[in-house]
Structures are given as structure tokens and as C-alpha cells.
Amino acid sequence: MEGRVSSVGSPHSFLNAPVLFRGPVEPLVFLANFALVLQGPLTTQYLWHRFSTELGYNGTRHRENCGNQSADPLMKEVETLTSHWTLYMNVGGFLVGLFWSTLLGAWSDRVGRRPLLVLASLGLLLQAVVSIFVVQLELHVGFFVLGRALCALLGDFNGLLAASFASVADVSSNHSRTFRMALLEACIGVAGTLASLLGGHWLRAQGYANPFWLALALLIVMALYAAFCFGETVKEPKSTRLFTLRHHRSIARLYVVPAPEKSRMHLALYSLAIFVVVTVHFGAQDILTLYELSAPLCWDSKLIGYGSAAQHLPYLTSLLGLRLLQFCLADTWVAEIGLAFNILGMVVFAFATITPLMFTGYGLLFLSLVTTPVIRAKLSKLVSESEQGALFSAVACVNSLAMLMASGIFNSIYPATLNFMKGFPFLLGAGLLFIPAILIGVLEKVNPHPEFQQFPQSP
């Protein structure tokens, strides 16, 4: 069974509330990412059309006339504004989440995973409410930044992922952990694919508001599930203060205090590897919608939806590929294969000027996401059972920093390179991916069979 009911003595009343059933964590991740992906491309398109209206840009979106718009200065200004406001939203979320995600993740090692899951669910719900107000009332787009910051204050999606991965580590065996991590990431992908397909068609039919209302409804269901249906996986939750430096010190100890079961070098270098992988992933994701909206592709909302769905399919295909490749290859070499396909996909995106070539790039990414579950599993096995929350909150911090770097690098380079090579950020991403490929290979050669921490089998 995935979870266990919280014990008496938990610090908050909802911890002591009886659960309706001992549910797994995967539905929470599915609902959260469905809601986020439903909102993400729509927010980018809303910003694009909002700035187009304000600047008086009326360029046709029909592909047959698209080539004539490539030199339009108004279109370039719309692209630049959209890119910059995407950056502002990500910076706002990072600056708040850097402190809170790490604090809450380490806190969950003592009080249990459920409090963090509930708080993160409420934060995502609050962000959706703010987005609805912006779209319905045509408020200043700066309120998107406010909603993002409020979400980060309660843990954000990174906090939810930290608690979710720690929950999986709590109950998985050493042998099954890599696949369980990949299964959790597959929930992200399936949700993203379905939300992308729905969002593109729905936008064409009914505009921006209704998809945001659906996201709000899903997040309400998610918050209720976290509070009353998720089965706690920490064996003995205990009451503890939230506002104490002890939680942050527990994260620092992971990397600076020697222990028999872990190598500080492996922890640091695997963290660097996942940092680079996440930076490239989210950097490319940040500019892909904008890249597809503008010349020479000029995709409409329907094609944007198909592209976003294709972007999330690797979560599922990577899960299947990981399961098959594990029969004949070590996890390390599965990760290397994933990085190779990721590099190929980035290179194709860089030179894609027609729709079939863009979808070829998406197709080459079918194994691109086997790398992150492998690294997460290796990190999880390097620390003790009581440090999983601290570890994954550290990984959440790495993710937040990577997302900020991704926004800063890709959203700054993209408008700066429009005049000489629009796809240059994708080439940069392909080059950066050689760093984790080298790190993972070197760590395997230096210590091919590290003494990972062995957890007891879950009942």
C-alpha cells in the first residue's frame, strides 16, 4: 500500500483528519500538471495577443502570408515583450520559492508529506484565481507575476514535486526506485499531453477564460485529495516548528557532512547534472510557444496545442523506453542515450522553418526524459531514509535555480538573436547537454558501483 495514516501528534489539524482511503501521490502530480499545462501556453498566447492589441499589431497569422512578416518591427516588439514578461514571472516565482521550497521540503521529513502537498495545492489554486481575474477583468499583466509569487510562497509545483518524490522514496525498494521515479514523471507527461490537446482546441472555440476555470476546478479537487485522501508515507510524523534554521541546516549537511552511505562528490556532481538538464528543458519550453507563434512557422492555437502535446509525450515514451532498456543496460547508459536524443532534438529545432521539421524535432525527444528519473533515483539512494525530504527539497531548489537560469538565458538570448539566427538558443541548449553527459559517464567510471543506501522493503 502506498501510504499510511498520519500518527497522533502531528502539528496541524488536517494531519489528524481521517483519510477517506490511503491514496497514492500520483493523482496529485497528474492533476497539478494538467492544470499548469492548461494554463502555461494559454498565458503565453494571452500575453502575445494582449501586447498585439496594445501595440496595434494586426499581422495575419495565416501561414501562407507568414514569410512577409519576418521583418515587421511590431511583431519583434510583441515577441520581446512576451519573452520579457515570461522572464519576470519566473524570476518572481524563483525569488520567493528559493527559500520556501527548501524550508517546506526539509520540514516534511518530520511532520509528513501531506502538509506540504496541501500547502502547494493551495498555492497553485491561488495562482489560478489570480490568472482568472487578469483574463476576465483585463487587469495589468503584472498581476501574473503576483500570482506566481503567491504560489511560490506556499511551496509551488517544485514543493509539490519534492514531497511527491520523497513520498515515492519512502515506500519504494532500492531495486524499483528508478522506475517509480519515472512513473511519477510519466504522470506529468500524460497530464501535459491531454491538457495541451484540450487547451488548443478550447481556446479556438471559446477563448481564454474557460480553460482557466477548468484549471481552477481541478486544483480544488487536488487540494481536497491531498487533505483527505493521500496516505501519509512518513512512518512517524512529529510536531515541529516550521520557522527554524534547522530545516535549512539539514539540507546543507547533505553536501558538507561526510557519512558512510553517501559520497559528497556524487551528490554535488549529480545535482549539477540535473541542474543543467532542467535548465535546457525549461529554457527550451519557455521559448517554444513563442518560436512557433512567430514567423516563419506562425502556428495557430490548434497547432500550438499539438506541439505542446508532442512536447509532453516523451514523459510517457521515456517511461516505456526506460523499462525496456533496463533489461539490457545499466541506468547510467540509459541516461546517456536519453541525452543523445535530447541533443538531436534541440539541433533540429534550431533549423526548423516548416511545421514537419518541428514535429521531427519533437519526435527525436522520445527518450529525452529518461535522464532525470535516473539521476533522482541515484541521489535518493545516496542519503538515508530520514533525509529524503531534505534531499528532494534541495533538488527542488536546484530546479528553481535552473528554471530561473533558463528564463534568464533563453528569454534574453532569444530576442537578442532574432536578427541573425532565431534558433540559436536551441543550439546553445544542445551544447550545454554535453556537460551532464560527461558528468554521468565520469561518475560511472570513477565509481561504477557506489554503496548506495539500502532502504527496507515497503510492506
UniProtKB/Swiss-Prot annotation:
<feature type="transmembrane region" description="Helical; Name=TM8">
    <location>
        <begin position="303"/>
        <end position="325"/>
    </location>
</feature>
<keyword id="KW-0967">Endosome</keyword>
<feature type="transmembrane region" description="Helical; Name=TM12">
    <location>
        <begin position="423"/>
        <end position="441"/>
    </location>
</feature>
<dbReference type="InterPro" id="IPR005829">
    <property type="entry name" value="Sugar_transporter_CS"/>
</dbReference>
<feature type="topological domain" description="Cytoplasmic">
    <location>
        <begin position="228"/>
        <end position="266"/>
    </location>
</feature>
<keyword id="KW-0963">Cytoplasm</keyword>
<protein>
    <recommendedName>
        <fullName>Proton-coupled folate transporter</fullName>
    </recommendedName>
</protein>
<feature type="transmembrane region" description="Helical; Name=TM2">
    <location>
        <begin position="83"/>
        <end position="108"/>
    </location>
</feature>
<dbReference type="GO" id="GO:0005886">
    <property type="term" value="C:plasma membrane"/>
</dbReference>
<feature type="topological domain" description="Extracellular">
    <location>
        <begin position="136"/>
        <end position="140"/>
    </location>
</feature>
<feature type="disulfide bond">
    <location>
        <begin position="66"/>
        <end position="298"/>
    </location>
</feature>
<dbReference type="GO" id="GO:0016323">
    <property type="term" value="C:basolateral plasma membrane"/>
</dbReference>
<feature type="topological domain" description="Cytoplasmic">
    <location>
        <begin position="442"/>
        <end position="459"/>
    </location>
</feature>
<dbReference type="GO" id="GO:0015884">
    <property type="term" value="P:folic acid transport"/>
</dbReference>
<feature type="topological domain" description="Cytoplasmic">
    <location>
        <begin position="326"/>
        <end position="331"/>
    </location>
</feature>
<feature type="transmembrane region" description="Helical; Name=TM4">
    <location>
        <begin position="141"/>
        <end position="154"/>
    </location>
</feature>
<keyword id="KW-0007">Acetylation</keyword>
<feature type="modified residue" description="N-acetylmethionine">
    <location>
        <position position="1"/>
    </location>
</feature>
<feature type="transmembrane region" description="Helical; Name=TM9">
    <location>
        <begin position="332"/>
        <end position="351"/>
    </location>
</feature>
<feature type="glycosylation site" description="N-linked (GlcNAc...) asparagine">
    <location>
        <position position="68"/>
    </location>
</feature>
<dbReference type="Pfam" id="PF07690">
    <property type="entry name" value="MFS_1"/>
</dbReference>
<keyword id="KW-0813">Transport</keyword>
<keyword id="KW-0472">Membrane</keyword>
<dbReference type="GO" id="GO:0005737">
    <property type="term" value="C:cytoplasm"/>
</dbReference>
<keyword id="KW-1003">Cell membrane</keyword>
<feature type="transmembrane region" description="Helical; Name=TM1">
    <location>
        <begin position="26"/>
        <end position="44"/>
    </location>
</feature>
<comment type="function">
    <text>Proton-coupled folate symporter that mediates folate absorption using an H(+) gradient as a driving force. Involved in the intestinal absorption of folates at the brush-border membrane of the proximal jejunum, and the transport from blood to cerebrospinal fluid across the choroid plexus. Functions at acidic pH via alternate outward- and inward-open conformation states. Protonation of residues in the outward open state primes the protein for transport.</text>
</comment>
<dbReference type="GO" id="GO:0008517">
    <property type="term" value="F:folic acid transmembrane transporter activity"/>
</dbReference>
<dbReference type="GO" id="GO:0031526">
    <property type="term" value="C:brush border membrane"/>
</dbReference>
<keyword id="KW-0597">Phosphoprotein</keyword>
<dbReference type="GO" id="GO:0005542">
    <property type="term" value="F:folic acid binding"/>
</dbReference>
<feature type="topological domain" description="Extracellular">
    <location>
        <begin position="352"/>
        <end position="355"/>
    </location>
</feature>
<feature type="transmembrane region" description="Helical; Name=TM3">
    <location>
        <begin position="113"/>
        <end position="135"/>
    </location>
</feature>
<dbReference type="GO" id="GO:0016324">
    <property type="term" value="C:apical plasma membrane"/>
</dbReference>
<keyword id="KW-0325">Glycoprotein</keyword>
<comment type="similarity">
    <text>Belongs to the major facilitator superfamily. SLC46A family.</text>
</comment>
<feature type="transmembrane region" description="Helical; Name=TM7">
    <location>
        <begin position="267"/>
        <end position="289"/>
    </location>
</feature>
<dbReference type="GO" id="GO:0140211">
    <property type="term" value="F:folic acid:proton symporter activity"/>
</dbReference>
<feature type="topological domain" description="Cytoplasmic">
    <location>
        <begin position="109"/>
        <end position="112"/>
    </location>
</feature>
<keyword id="KW-1133">Transmembrane helix</keyword>
<dbReference type="InterPro" id="IPR036259">
    <property type="entry name" value="MFS_trans_sf"/>
</dbReference>
<feature type="topological domain" description="Extracellular">
    <location>
        <begin position="290"/>
        <end position="302"/>
    </location>
</feature>
